[in-house]
């Protein structure tokens, strides 16, 4: 599966002066070098800056905690993967045979990485101002959907605050297993409470995502017992 040049009217919203940047941004490491991991690294920083700036301007009364939680929600893997699908990146990725066979073009982690790489490619192609103008509209619906200044706290934070409010021991997160190739990891984690006694297991493409899922399930257990 290989990339095609973005045509006028394509959802990405940018015509590359240097098509090689686009090609590299869409080339997964499974397809060999050069691949998009360095662009992904740069794009991660740019996306965080763009979203931080947008939230800072839109939420003048929000405190640091609310801004941080909102940014985390907008740049998480699942949210970026949704953008990747909206931009039709999956069908344009250059993948190795193994990833093609396993449906890598549909995997959240690969799509999220590709979005970050595309952001970096746009930045290198035309500079920060143009990059902001192209990329922020991708996030507009998600930005508008956030309750102003009151971003939903992630499950781990909510669980911790619930326990602290009752002066109970904080949860323990234990790694049960880690599997998969380096670019397609799967983590299996348990969230364990001493008091009240509770345990749940979560899985995800990163340890953080697995812990969040496990915390969500523990919260559901606590809610059902109250």
From Swiss-Prot:
UniProt subcellular location: Cytoplasm
Cross-referenced Gene3D superfamilies: 3.30.160.20, Ribonuclease III domain
Protein name in UniProt: Ribonuclease 3
SMART domains: DSRM (SM00358), RIBOc (SM00535)
HAMAP family: RNase_III
Function according to Swiss-Prot or TrEMBL: Digests double-stranded RNA. Involved in the processing of primary rRNA transcript to yield the immediate precursors to the large and small rRNAs (23S and 16S). Processes some mRNAs, and tRNAs when they are encoded in the rRNA operon. Processes pre-crRNA and tracrRNA of type II CRISPR loci if present in the organism.
Binding partners and assembly: Homodimer.
Catalytic activity: Endonucleolytic cleavage to 5'-phosphomonoester
Keyword vocabulary terms for this entry: Cytoplasm, Endonuclease, Hydrolase, Magnesium, Metal-binding, mRNA processing, Nuclease, RNA-binding, rRNA processing, rRNA-binding, tRNA processing
GO BP, sorted A to Z: mRNA processing; regulation of gene expression; rRNA processing; tRNA processing
Pfam family, one: Ribonucleas_3_3
Organism, as annotated: Xanthomonas euvesicatoria pv. vesicatoria (strain 85-10) (Xanthomonas campestris pv. vesicatoria)
Family membership: Belongs to the ribonuclease III family.
GO MF entry, a single one: rRNA binding
Entry annotation: catalytic residues: 44, 116
PANTHER family: RIBONUCLEASE 3, RIBONUCLEASE III
Cofactor needs: Mg(2+)
GO annotations of cellular component type: cytoplasm
Binding site for Mg(2+): 40, 113, 116
Domain DRBM: from-to ranges: 154-224
EC number(s) reported in the record: 3.1.26.3
Gene name linked to the record: rnc
Domain (RNase III): residue spans on this chain: 5-127
